[in-house]
Regions:
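Active-site machinery of serine-nucleophile hydrolases
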Residues: 84-93
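Bacterial N-terminal signal peptides that target proteins for export
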Residues: 1-8
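C-terminal motif of bacterial Sec signal peptides marking the signal peptidase cleavage site
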Residues: 17-18
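Bacterial Sec signal peptide processing site at the extreme N-terminus
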Residues: 21-31
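Active-site glycine-rich loops that stabilize anionic/oxyanionic intermediates
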Residues: 68-71, 137
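Structural cue for short, hydrophobic secondary-structure segments
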Residues: 65-68, 91
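Flexible "cap/lid" subdomain of the alpha/beta-hydrolase fold that forms the substrate-access gate
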Residues: 29-50, 55-58, 62, 90, ...
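Serine-hydrolase catalytic-loop signature spanning alpha/beta hydrolases and amidase-signature enzymes
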Residues: 70-78, 89
């Protein structure tokens, strides 16, 4: 009995010493836990409900993610999740895209000027006045309008196949150029394949190394939205208006020369619409570029997202 009491006392002493041990400094270091929760919100902008995805701490540097055609904020789902530990990320859907309101083309002017004005007002209402932009496809004409209107607000540009040069217009524009020359039933009809499920799938898989690595949810979501009444009319209006972006290229190039914004290029070189020549052209106006070319297509994040997100993280820390 005496031995049992001694053993019990010894065990209690060992436990007490263990509890009083100084904590390992490695264990007490603060950790960067990923804030992977993405919030799905809406904001009324001049009578239009703008849907947007948001993640990360608003006290961290902000990156505004501007999507392309035919997509929505959905194209940035990986970025919103993976980079939210160090950055505040916000990705709006343009009017007529994603989960935002889709006013009829008879009631709403679908031009890049008008869409950019809504995104500018959206950021104003969100009180976001210092931010980097990530641009892709349609995100470039939206983003460069924001940048030229308020250059002091732009902290950096992350460019994934967002064009600003005539040299960057590829073979994929031939049908749309015919629409610019003469918009009629024939030139519109020639573009309708783009809105089919097969045409949308092609946009995501053309130029990729492994098409089977591209999530089919991307083009299936876009196709469902293409089935809405007047959706084709809305997109044809924007195709037709794209020629006005080209007229603004000199203005955007001057912005780049005058302001020399930090620029990260992460470009899919096999893009039929914006080939690598579009990426190369930025070297004419920006002195220092973090320049990265990928052997993939129009939506480089789909196939090379992990490396691109690593590049974004490194670039934004410089």
């Amino acid at each position: 009995m005496k031995n049992l009491k001694s053993i019990t006392t010894l065990l209690l002493l060992i436990l007490a010493l263990g509890c009083s041990k100084k904590p390992n400094t490695e264990d007490t270091k603060p950790k960067h836990d990923k804030m992977t929760t993405i919030q799905y919100k809406n904001l009324n902008v001049n009578g239009i409900s703008i849907a947007y995805r948001e993640s990360g701490n608003p006290k961290n540097p902000t990156i505004v993610l501007l999507h392309g055609f035919p997509s929505s904020s959905h194209q940035y789902r990986k970025v919103l999740s993976e980079l939210s530990d160090e950055f505040h990320l916000i990705a709006p859907d343009y009017p007529g895209f994603g989960e935002s309101d889709f006013p009829s083309p008879e009631d709403f002017t679908y031009t890049f000027d008008n869409i950019a004005s809504y995104i500018e007002k959206f950021l104003e209402l969100k009180k976001i006045d210092s931010y980097a932009i990530m641009i892709q496809d349609y995100g470039a004409p939206i983003g460069f309008r924001l940048a030229t209107a308020n250059p002091s607000k732009i902290t950096a540009i992350i460019n994934q196949n967002g064009n600003a040069y005539k040299a960057g217009l590829g073979e994929g524009w031939k049908g749309i150029e015919a629409l610019w020359a003469n918009r009629n039933e024939e030139t519109e009809k020639a573009l309708l394949f783009v809105f089919s499920k097969e045409g949308l799938k092609w946009q995501y898989t053309h130029g990729t190394r492994n098409p089977e690595h591209v999530n089919p949810d991307t083009w299936n979501l876009d196709y469902l939205r293409m089935l809405r009444p007047k959706a084709h009319k809305m997109h044809l209006d924007l195709f037709y208006d794209y020629q006005n972006n080209i007229k603004l290229y000199p203005k955007w190039q001057k912005y780049l020369r005058d302001n020399q914004p930090p620029l990260l290029i992460v470009w899919g070189k096999n893009d039929a619409f914006f080939p690598e020549s579009g990426a190369e052209a930025f070297k004419n106006d920006v002195k220092k570029i973090d320049y990265n070319i990928y052997d993939t297509g129009h939506f480089a994040l789909e196939e090379d997202g992990d490396d691109i997100m690593r590049k974004i993280r490194e670039f934004m820390k410089k």
